[in-house]
């Protein structure tokens, strides 16, 4: 996935396309178009129009139509159960380039808002609602698409889409984890194969950067649903949502979700296993680019040496050496 190039010529071209899209959908051109740098694969424009304020996202990648379609399905589903999210008005193509029109959301990214504990408590509450939406099949392709490439079982997802064994081999190849640690993670994941898992909707990246709040710290929208998936919950959701939080914020999220602390303790090994294994792509990228600094930092992080709240296996092994 290549980020959009910040070239004036390309921006002017996509601004003209955005104007055509808006005029096509609303019958008259916008009064103002402002380019919004996204740093991702889309060209994003804020639109002022007599019909309201909108956002147009245009991708140079033809396959992005599926991601936009998925986002429309997910936002409609969660809005039905009271989760604030952007209203997607249209998904289409202009030539080979997909686009999506949404109603503009008011507010700003939650990351630096002073009421973080309040916000994260609400994030937990909304996560529970999102995870209560039952789905069929496992992985990125589920109810939103008629694509027949779906995983009917949890084991299918682990082996085919998530590519569990290959991911584990990354940690061995780059000496991120000991064979004992890898065996332990493998057992945790393999034990889930015999569980009766009812898949449900997971946002897949429910972090501050994907939460929009107003001045009072009230959530106005949860955004970026492209990575949502049908999978086990709440373990998968928590493995990502808790990743960047302080210990107090973790507690607030869990409280907002309504989880019993004993239940969290029971789920903890699986949450940690998901979190660790999802580092495999980052480790591979660092190795491919010969980023030795990042590799060393990943190795330190995955050893548990930065965990100040429990004695990890690695720490106990060093203590007994």
Q: Which residues are covered by each model-predicted region?
A:
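An alpha-helical support segment within catalytic cores of ATP-dependent transferases
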Residues: 9-29, 128, 132-204, 214, ...
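ATP-binding pocket architecture of kinase catalytic cores
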Residues: 32-153
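The feature marks helicase ATPase cores and/or their adjacent C-terminal helical subdomains
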Residues: 36, 199-200, 274, 290-294, ...
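Conserved catalytic motifs of the protein kinase core domain
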Residues: 51, 97, 197-199, 218
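Glycine-rich, phosphate-binding/catalytic loops in enzymes
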Residues: 72-73, 118-119, 237-241, 301
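Active-site Asp-x-Gly
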Residues: 199-201, 207-209, 213-268
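Hydrophobic alpha-helical segments that form the core
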Residues: 271-281
């Amino acid at each position: 996935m290549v980020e959009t190039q910040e070239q004036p010529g390309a921006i002017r071209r996509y601004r003209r396309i955005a104007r055509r899209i808006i005029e096509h959908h609303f019958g008259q051109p916008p009064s103002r178009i402002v380019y919004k740098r996204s740093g991702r694969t889309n060209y994003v424009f804020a639109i002022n129009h007599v019909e309201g304020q909108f956002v147009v996202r245009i991708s140079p990648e033809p396959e992005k139509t599926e991601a936009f379609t998925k986002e429309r399905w997910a936002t409609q589903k969660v809005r039905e159960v009271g989760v604030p999210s952007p209203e997607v008005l249209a998904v289409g193509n202009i030539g080979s380039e997909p686009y999506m029109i949404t109603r503009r959301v008011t507010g700003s990214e939650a990351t630096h808002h002073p009421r973080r504990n309040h916000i994260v408590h609400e994030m937990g509450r909304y996560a529970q609602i999102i995870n209560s939406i039952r789905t069929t099949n496992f992985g990125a392709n589920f109810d939103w698409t008629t694509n027949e490439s779906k995983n009917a079982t949890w084991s299918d997802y682990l082996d085919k889409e998530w590519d569990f064994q290959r991911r584990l081999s990354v940690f061995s190849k780059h000496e991120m984890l000991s064979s004992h640690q890898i065996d332990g993670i493998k057992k945790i994941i393999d034990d889930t194969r015999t569980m009766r898992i009812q898949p449900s909707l997971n946002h897949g990246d429910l972090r501050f950067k994907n939460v929009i709040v107003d001045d009072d710290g009230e959530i106005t929208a949860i955004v970026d649903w492209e990575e949502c998936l049908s999978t086990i919950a709440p373990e998968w959701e928590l493995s990502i949502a808790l990743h960047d939080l302080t210990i107090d914020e973790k507690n607030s999220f869990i409280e907002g979700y309504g989880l019993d602390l004993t239940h969290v303790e029971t789920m903890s090994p699986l949450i940690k296993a998901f979190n660790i294994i999802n580092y495999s792509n980052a480790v591979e990228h660092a190795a491919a680019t010969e980023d030795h600094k990042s590799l060393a930092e990943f190795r330190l992080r995955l050893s548990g040496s930065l965990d100040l709240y429990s004695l990890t296996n690695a720490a106990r092994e060093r203590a007994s050496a």
